[in-house]
Swiss-Prot record:
Name of the protein described by the UniProt record: Bifunctional purine biosynthesis protein PurH
Alphabetical list of Pfam families matching this protein: AICARFT_IMPCHas, MGS
Taxon lineage: Bacteria, Bacillati, Bacillota, Bacilli, Bacillales
Keyword Transferase included in the entry's annotation: yes
BP GO annotations: 'de novo' IMP biosynthetic process
Record organism: Lysinibacillus sphaericus (strain C3-41)
Amino acid sequence: MTKRALISVSNKDGILEFAKELVALGYEILSTGGTKKMLQDNAVAVTAVDEVTKFPEILDGRVKTLNPMIHGGLLGKFDDDSHQAQMNEHGIEPIEIVCVNLYPFVETISKPNVTWDDAIENIDIGGPTMLRSAAKNHQYVTVIVDSNDYATVLEELKAGGATTIETRRKLAAKVFRHTAAYDSYISNYLTEEEFPESLTMTYELKQNLRYGENPHQKAAFYQKRLGSDFSLAYATQLHGKELSYNNIQDGNAALQIVKEFEMPAAVAVKHMNPCGVGTGVTLEEAFDKAYEADPTSIFGGIIALNMEVDAATAEKLSHIFLEIIIAPAFSQEALDILTKKKNIRLLTIPFEQAKQDQFNVVSVEGGLLVQEPDRYGFANADIKVVTDREPTKQEWEALQLGWSVVKHVKSNAIVVTDSQMTLGVGAGQMNRVGAAKIAFEQAGEKAKGAALASDAFFPMSDTVEAAAAAGITAIIQPGGSIKDQDSIDKANEYGITMIFTGVRHFKH
């Protein structure tokens, strides 16, 4: 009996050569629609599916292969006498190979002006059904959903007349991953609930990593197919070694901070916390400020810049050991300077597409925590000056800078700033005064006349007391403590201006 292969693909890459090889190996090709026409136009003998089903395509092609003559051939066990008897009774012949890929639903909904009707018409029904039938029966049927697998299948067919059970099992598993992902894109597109009763997310493997956070941990990097282009997952690497797990974590943290600024800005990150943030009239000035903020911790750090890197900035960057530099672009002169450093990684990301994902997702043992990103910045805050003294223009600028940075620092967080740069960062402390002391120690004499930003309210007035001792003259914090008045009174006592925002910025 002639072996049969059913081919129906929307992605025609490599399919003509694959079909010709199957014919040469003695397979009869079954096909439908555009695939059938393409094969026939290229002199490949094809049997139309409706010749097998004895039923025409109907409903504008919505029903083609949904027929027992097809699915019986896919699901029947080749070595089961009962199955074979039933197939013979109904004139059903087995199908040994299925090669199907699906309507381009994701590509369709990615178009800027896609209509609802276009999206719905690109939901494939017959394709996933055939794939699942063939994958279920992989003991006997070879199912292919990825053109990268054509060569492996042909190699095994030529060598032994059939594919191995190991290959068929791997291909079947790939099919079920593929159809599950396909369905998740559809369900997410159709879902209107913010937090539905079940949550299905699809990520595709971008790369295997050398190791995870530590050398004994295995790791890989997955990306969203419909994710934001403003992401390391879609960055273009111009130079350097492949990214590590920690590089990706730190790079992502740097990106989230630098996109807070419209003026030229530079952000240095170590262990997912900023060690230096600087702004300026030029990018070179912004980097100078970020470096000045903490010239020790920046060593081995990640730098994110929000403007094209020019030669002057690149020259200064080249004198420091840095893991990664991320920017919208690099001038040719800057590339010539920086690529002399063998190991530094240079990445570009389209800043004009800077946006956040719909949700932040955190894995916990046995589940996921899902929340909206913290999108509230200075412009969203309900600013209230709660002290007798109003901030000066320079203090307002320093407070705004501090508030833009502190939301990205691990809680409890205190950030000390002037109008252009961070002066001290107290991160991840179990009490607020402890975080403040770290920030003051780092700022040193520069804390005098500077501003302080706190990610959460002061439970008592001791942080204001410590700020006054360090020389701080302006404070920004959410407010909301039952002892707010104590902090206000203490600020007034020392002539400190203080504003409440009404917004907390915990970060764990």
